[in-house]
Amino acid sequence: MNNRPIRLLTSGRAGLGAGALITAVVLLIALGAVWTPVAFADGCPDAEVTFARGTGEPPGIGRVGQAFVDSLRQQTGMEIGVYPVNYAASRLQLHGGDGANDAISHIKSMASSCPNTKLVLGGYSQGATVIDIVAGVPLGSISFGSPLPAAYADNVAAVAVFGNPSNRAGGSLSSLSPLFGSKAIDLCNPTDPICHVGPGNEFSGHIDGYIPTYTTQAASFVVQRLRAGSVPHLPGSVPQLPGSVLQMPGTAAPAPESLHGR
């Protein structure tokens, strides 16, 4: 388990499914990824994105994660660090709990070593499931791991997930997370069979359907949270429960099936 902050930039592609969907998505998505460490003068960026990649991707944050980070940088002009969640994003999807534990360990480390850094959590496809666990979203009757302790919730400024399978299994992160409800945006392309139930689904909706429309929209939402000026607290006190829901930024067609605030 990594306890030292690591800020990385990555690129790649990922996918997630169940049964026949898994094989098809992995075959269509699995591409190489290259990441390069980025150092900050004092080791603490203005904000940091902890992102979990999807099924079959090499270590890193994946193509969707990279597009999200790039858009966030462009919109804020801030120093944005990146931490890729360390877990085996395998086809059998047995390691989501490991990924959640790694993300939680890193959040705790950042709260201690960089208390003024605003933390952003994100995930795509199977990686969204990892963030569901961190956020305390129930995944049916199966327990995959423990959520982030409530004492650290205020250190997290925003959450953004894409192609989240939990939307097919009971609801969105933004509607079900007791820690991050109003801080979260959960985006599902309405042609994505991994998160959407209904006609018109195509594998391309999951693989190619999130860049740039949805990654830009998610970044715009996160920018609002980062500029809200909430000051991280030292762990120990119980954070205030999420309050009002922020209005979603507009997007170009095709409009995403946003599950924020539902």
UniProtKB/Swiss-Prot annotation:
Residue(s) at site: Transition state stabilizer: 126
Pfam families per the UniProt record, alphabetical: Cutinase (PF01083)
Residue ranges, annotated region (Disordered): 241-262
Cellular compartment(s): Secreted
Signal sequence, renumbered to the chain: 1-41
Enzyme class: hydrolase
Protein origin, superkingdom: Bacteria
Disulfide bond residue pairs: 44-114, 188-195
GO molecular function, a single term: carboxylesterase activity
SMART domains, sorted: Cutinase (SM01110)
Keyword Secreted attributed: yes
Record: active site: 125, 192, 206
Major site of localization recorded for this protein: secreted
GO CC annotations, alphabetized: extracellular region
Keyword field: Disulfide bond, Hydrolase, Secreted, Serine esterase, Signal
Gene Ontology BP annotations: lipid catabolic process
Assigned EC number: 3.1.1.-
Function noted in UniProt: Shows weak esterase activity with the p-nitrophenol-linked aliphatic ester pNP-butyrate. Does not exhibit cutinase activity.
Annotated PANTHER family: CUTINASE 4, CUTINASE RV1984C-RELATED-RELATED
Family to which this protein belongs: Belongs to the cutinase family.
Annotated protein name in UniProt: Probable carboxylesterase Culp3
Organism listed in the record: Mycobacterium tuberculosis (strain ATCC 25618 / H37Rv)
The encoding gene: cut3
